[in-house]
Amino acid sequence: DGIGFVRNLKEHGVDVKGKKMVVLGAGGAATAIQVQCALDGAESISIFNPKDPFFARAESTAEKLSKETPDCKVSVFDLADEAKLKEEVANADILVNATLAGMKPHEELTLIKDKSMFRPDLVVADVVYNPAQTRMVKEAKEAGCKLAIGGKGMLLWQGAAAYKLYTGLEMPTAEYQKFQEENENK
């Protein structure tokens, strides 16, 4: 997940190196993204998660990353603290939804309740790929964010990384992308 996420950003002209990030979520995909972005040189990662069993996991991830990647400041906050979320997003370069919010059959859900958090220089990325554009991505585009992308690219690039790992060969990604484009609205 982490490799696919970072590659998807790179394919859209965004490098995480030196960037301030806000990541919503602390599950498996979120943790992989946090770790990969820290390893790839993100300046800071602010993790927001509800005070559920995954919150302790987020705190553990932050502690480990602080030791392994001391140049990346990792902090954990309660998702219920909307003022802190707004503050952190205001200072972020990249906002990531790494939760199930917005995934079918709950397309109406978004964790960003205040659309004023979106601004033109903010990159918004979602791991959800069904639907191709979540409510968060749509609202970010409407607000004029320079880049707002769904999770299909992450899915492609994590698959390509796994394909190479298992076969030693490059996955024919152009063929897959063409197939996706042809079947997007079917």
Regions found by a protein language model. Give the residues of each.
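Adenosine-phosphate binding glycine-rich loop
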Residues: 18, 121-123, 127-186
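Residues at the starts of beta-strands that form the adenosine-phosphate
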Residues: 20, 43-44, 73
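Glycine-rich adenosine-cofactor-binding loop
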Residues: 2, 18-38, 49
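Rossmann-like adenosine-cofactor binding region
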Residues: 71-148
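Rossmann-fold NAD(P)-dependent oxidoreductase module
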Residues: 8, 32-36, 139
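Short, flexible coil/linker segments at domain boundaries that flank nucleotide/cofactor-interacting
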Residues: 15-18, 40, 118-119
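NAD(P)-binding Rossmann-fold cofactor-contacting core
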Residues: 40-69
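Glycine/small-residue-rich loop that forms an oxyanion/phosphate-binding "nest" at active or ligand-binding sites
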Residues: 1-19
